[in-house]
Amino acid sequence: MLLAQALEKRGDDERAFSEYQNLLLLYPQNVDFEEVQARQFDIATRFLSGQRYKLWGRIPLYRSMSKTTAMFQNIVNIGPFSSVAPEAQMNIGQAWVKKARGFQISQNERHKNYRHAVEAFSKVADKYHDRPEIAAEGLFAAAAAYQRQSLDSEYDQGVTEKAIDSYSDFIALYPNEEKVAAAREQIKAMKVEQARGSLKIARYYEKKGKLAGANVYYNEVKDLAPGTDYAEVALQKIAELQPKLDSLRQSGAAPE
């Protein structure tokens, strides 16, 4: 214990974390388990907050959310129900989000990091379901991670549906949580964005003369975002298209 404390005191946090880990693995009966995990949690949190990893334990060099997630994962693995474990599991997700929002060599890599974040947050909601406050926090964070991932216009917009579903689950399971209003606002914002996309598709179909297809998407717009400018445009278009569609049907031609 003295070696780990000395390393931490002089700022060699990475080695200190490893020494604390060795104590828990090799001498679990001879140390205060909760105290050691608390020290590890504080060290990992410093790295999560932006502290740099050091070269030779002395020269601050780089930040690494991958190494930070591994630290928090070690805490959870060895003490899944310790006092710091739920927050450590949350911080695994936060570290993946930070990594996703940093420089990435490809979109696929960024989306993979968001998926890791969702998995970490979802584990909070599942593993600690008997602690509503932390479980609610995990579910809300999972929804937010899905939402961030959906902001990439080139990515599968099915992720938006997953975000909406997760926020909806949060509202249904934790109706008294303070963030319910925020969840509703995020759902509304995402549906408006979906409506904008559907309106573009509807206009494309209409321009190509595929009136039935355009009508389907205009109806989708009005259902997704009632009361918005998008819905008003869609309702006007539906009214304009209906006589044309009726005329095509009466003539025996199947509208596209």
Feature map (PLM): residue ranges:
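Acidic, polar-rich low-complexity tracts and alpha-helical solenoid repeat scaffolds
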Residues: 1-256
